[in-house]
Regions:
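C-terminal helical cap/extension that packs against the catalytic core
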Residues: 53-54, 368-427
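Residue-level signal for inorganic ion chemistry
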Residues: 31, 78, 119, 148, ...
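Short internal beta-strands
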Residues: 37-44, 221-225, 356-357, 376-385
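Phosphate-binding loop of NTP-binding sites
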Residues: 70-75, 82-225, 229-240, 255, ...
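N-terminal leader/targeting and accessory segments in enzymes
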Residues: 1-103, 301
Length: 461
């Protein structure tokens, strides 16, 4: 099915699009331009939407806004925004009456004419997705990047060729209702996350599994065998399972032997590069490269991989060196919105650091973070709703002694950054590594990271 054919199939149907955000707006405008009747529902008020509300109404859109935006929902086809649970009562009632519940990403999977490579996991998704996409580009492939990064691809599907590649980063929210899987799936790792939205860890893991559950026998799924959850998942993949490991050799996939990154396939193995070739810091980035190599094996030459690894400096907000100020290095790791991500960042430094942590409470445990802070942090500056939980995790950790690390509270984030600056000495490292989401103070992790960078870059020498 092509995009044009899908649009024709929508004619005469009542369409509801829930959430007028980044992923749904291009679809909404496309349908309206085609003369299709669309109702757009958004919990924001008309005042909060500003000129966008008037613009959509001028295009012929019916708007349901504000607290009761789902009241009287009635449609033949409902497009769900990724952040909204599919089982809210209003949607469930509509589905029971025969409505089709879908999403921009689900439709893209139906109509995409080229192979899809998709990445999910708790940590490393964006970096791994970016590495895969950039390697394919360096190898001369035409690549479309979307999902959680890039931009919505559905409206561009008719411009794609069968020889292109679509490379996607997919979240658990996007995957919850997926009934199709990509040609190549990558699961970087799984750890507790987003338990403020998912009922429990089991539902979170089940959502992630949709990235490979619907694959055919000819498709490929790549798993981190060092992670207990993803290692178990690899035994249930319907397609060809490939593994990657930093801790031991694998029969089919990519692994570390000393400093050598080795790819093994069909009984043959080769050294693709060494860990010294990887410019990005941290063992977690070695894992990201191993996952990416397994995904592009046979599509990209080893020379291209080595050259890229030596040059690629990483993705913004991921252990990003902001500035060295008066002998102190300041890093922006705002993407570290969970304990596991924060741990990976802390382990990338050779010295004990000054850590700024805390934020929105996603109802995930911090027990695993406590010992890592004890081992890697000299001063912990806490702010945000989770400050007390993180403090308790550190103080209850094995090996903790009062003052090791020292823990102080400073809120909001601007005050925490100032406190870190006041205490830092030449040679120190200060890292914004929140271990939490940003929604208590910021729109998202990027806005939080930009705020941090603006403060640090604004200091006069």
């Amino acid at each position: 099915m092509t995009l044009h054919e899908y649009i024709e199939d929508m004619r005469g149907k009542r369409i509801a699009i829930i959430g007028i955000g980044v992923s749904n707006t291009p679809l909404l405008e496309l349908l309206l331009a085609e003369g299709i009747r669309v109702t757009a529902c958004d919990k924001r008020s008309r005042e909060q939407m500003g000129e966008q509300a008037e613009h959509l109404e001028q295009l012929g859109c019916e708007l349901h806004l504000g607290a009761d935006y789902l009241k009287d929902l009635d449609a033949d086809v409902i497009f769900r925004t990724p952040g909204l649970r599919p089982d809210v009562p209003e949607i469930s009632a509509c589905v029971q009456k025969g409505a089709v519940l879908t999403s921009e990403m689900e439709v893209f999977f139906r109509i995409c004419p080229c192979p899809i490579i998709a990445v999910t996991g708790s940590d490393g998704k964006t970096t791994t997705t970016t590495i895969i996409a950039e390697l394919l580009k360096k190898a001369g492939k035409r690549v479309w990047v979307g999902g959680n990064i890039g931009h919505p691809l559905l409206c561009e599907a008719d411009g794609m060729l069968s020889t292109d590649f679509a490379v996607l980063e997919l979240s658990s929210f996007q995957l919850m209702t997926m009934t199709q899987s990509p040609h190549i799936a990558v699961v970087t790792n799984l750890a507790p996350n987003h338990l403020d939205v998912h009922r429990d860890m089991a539902e979170y893991v089940a959502a992630k599994e949709n990235i490979f559950t619907h694959q055919s026998r000819e498709d490929i799924a790549i798993f981190n065998v060092d992670n207990a959850i993803t290692a178990e998942q690899s035994t249930r993949a319907p397609g060809h399972a490939r593994l990657f490991s930093r801790q031991g050799e694998v029969a089919d996939g990519v692994f570390l032997r000393g400093e050598d990154v080795v790819c093994r396939s069909g009984g043959h193995e080769r050294i693709v590069m060494t860990t010294r070739d990887i410019k990005l810091p941290g063992v977690h980035n070695v894992e990201n490269y191993m996952a990416a190599i397994a995904a592009v094996d046979g599509l990209v030459s080893d020379q291209v991989i080595r050259t890229f690894a030596r040059e690629f400096g990483g993705v913004e907000h991921r252990i990003e060196l902001v500035r060295t100020y008066k002998g102190v290095r300041y890093y922006n790791d705002s993407i570290a919105s969970s304990p596991s991500r924060a741990i990976a960042g802390l382990r990338s430094f050779s010295e004990k650091v000054i850590m700024i942590a805390g934020g929105y409470d996603k109802h995930i445990p911090f027990d695993v973070l406590g010992p890592e802070i004890v081992a890697h942090v000299k001063l912990l500056v806490l702010c945000g709703a989770t400050a007390d939980k993180i403090r308790a995790a550190v103080e209850n950790a094995s090996g903790y002694r009062p003052g090791h690390p020292e823990i102080i509270d400073a809120a909001p984030l601007a005050a925490a950054v100032q406190a870190a600056r006041d205490r830092a000495q030449p040679g120190d490292v200060v890292t914004l590594s929140p271990a939490c989401a940003s929604f208590d103070q910021f729109k998202n992790f990027a806005e939080r990271g930009d705020f941090f960078k603006a403060i640090v870059n604004g200091w006069e020498e």
